Amino acid sequence: MILCCGEALIDMLPRDTTLGEKGFAPYAGGAIFNTAIALGRLGIPTAFFTGIADDMMGEILLETLKASNVDYSPCAITPRPSTIAFVKLVNGQATYAFYDEGTAGRMITTADLPDLGDDCEALHFGAISLIPSPCGETYEALLDREAASRVISLDPNIRPGFIKDKPSHMARIKRMAAKSDIVKFSDEDLDWFGLQGDHDALAAHWLNHGAKLVVITKGAEGASGYTKDRKVTVPSERVTVVDTVGAGDTFDAGILASLKMDNLLTKRQVASLDEQALRNGPDPRRQSRRRHRLPRRRQSTLGARDWSLRLEQDSDPHPPDDTFSP
């Protein structure tokens, strides 16, 4: 089982009303939430941990998790409000207005941490849930508690507009990355850290600081996976891009699902992946249609919502004409 640990929120996506007026409609979202949903819909045993509100928005989140076969029993259900994000899309790129003060997700503490059984093989962390207090400290404490015995995956998913104290957040990401087995960065994430060197040098930096597998996504140029012994670069797949909301989150699910499906989700095996296993990890074009179509379909629908329902509906094996950007 893979436990995804991080934010769940309601994305208010722009919609036109029946009268032609501008409005918004609620959809379940959040970076780590999206990864959990993708894993569950791929048939990977998945659980999710965060704080979820006992309100109508929280019901949307829980119903979506249940429908995607994600176990939400580790979640802390509280009377605090839900996090709401109003989304503006410009040329497929999203900007957000967040309402997060005192919310169920933000206010979790170490008292809310779940007990984990032997069936939990890996934990996945990242994104904006690592920024504020007290939830940022809470997720870091969970990683510290479990890092010695389970695979740890981290996607910093840097959002500079939400980070008010860059040195503090950078220090947290560095501490967590040093204890993580898998670390995924976008090229924009790496720019934020301000380190010098090309991607090969930057991957070596993070490997030398503790990571066993580093994956770097490069938009239309594809992705590269690194261990201390080898590097594999995989080109991107051509799709029709509607927007990129949740694309990186789905990519994270693809990495974890690939390792799980190939029985490689242990600390020792992640550290010693052969070339084919390394290629499978960052490759959105997995040899199984069911695996490789997930990130491609994600790019072809609007928002991080009903995209994966198309896995069973779409049997066309031929990719569309635009470029997939992880």
Curated annotation (Swiss-Prot):
Coiled-coil regions, chain positions: none
Keywords on record: ATP-binding, Carbohydrate metabolism, Kinase, Nucleotide-binding, Transferase
Assigned EC number: 2.7.1.4
Biased composition (Basic residues): 287-299
Superkingdom per UniProt: Bacteria
Gene3D superfamilies hit by this protein: 3.40.1190.20
Segments of skewed composition (Basic and acidic residues): 307-326
Transmembrane segments: none
Keyword ATP-binding: yes
Record keyword ATP-binding present: yes
Region (Disordered): 275-326
InterPro entries: Carboh/pur_kinase_PfkB_CS (IPR002173), PfkB_Carbo_kinase (IPR050306), PfkB_dom (IPR011611), Ribokinase-like (IPR029056)
Family, as annotated: Belongs to the carbohydrate kinase PfkB family.
Protein name in UniProt: Fructokinase
Gene behind this protein: frk
